[in-house]
Amino acid sequence: MSLERVLMGSALMLLLGNAHALEGRKIFAEGGSQPGAMPCIACHGADGAGMAAAGFPRLAGLPATYVRKQLEDFKSGSRTNPVMQPLANALTDAEIEAVSQVLAAMPAPVPQVVYRSEMPINAAQKLAQQGAWERQIPACASCHGPAGTGVGDAFPPLAGQPAAYLEAQLTAWQSGTRHNDPNDLMGHIA
């Protein structure tokens, strides 16, 4: 293989990757190619930080595989939401992949540093840092990481998510209306 072919192949891959990112940014800002594929920016904000007052979650900085799974779950019906299901159904698989990559590349908020040695000042902090073992509830940090920064692709960051969104998700896990976790970990915890 000649150096010229290697350089041409590398340049082509760079251009394709850049085109993929541009498509993802377009979907985020303007919507997908199908009717009903509204722009993400409408609910999740220009920076992907969500809209706390309306309970729309932060998407910026979430792992691409996590975002892709959630959109695919909305599309298949294994995760239900009257707003997100029709939007996800209107996205093609390529659009889901592109927007997932763009969201993952957006900067996430810097979480507040929490030291395990600090005593929680309220019930929510106690649950997050220490859990409620008397009710067999592990600390949120056990799966979602210190300061809620997330662990891998399976345990998303909680830091920076609006409280109303987190409360709605816990309620959905508790009632069984959210069940897109193969092991139902959160269903048991909630």
Segments and roles (model prediction):
Residues 37-46, 99, 137-147:
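The canonical Cys-X-X-Cys-His
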Residues 8-17:
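Bacterial N-terminal signal peptides
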Residues 17-36, 47, 55, 105-134:
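Electrostatic cytochrome c docking/interface patches
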Residues 1-8:
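Bacterial N-terminal signal peptides that target proteins for export
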Residues 42, 51-58, 73-116, 151-157, ...:
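Axial heme c-ligation environment in periplasmic c-type cytochrome domains
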Residues 23-27, 66-69, 83-86, 98, ...:
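Extracytoplasmic/secreted proteins, especially bacterial periplasmic and envelope-associated proteins
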Residues 22-25, 29-30, 36-76:
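The feature marks the first
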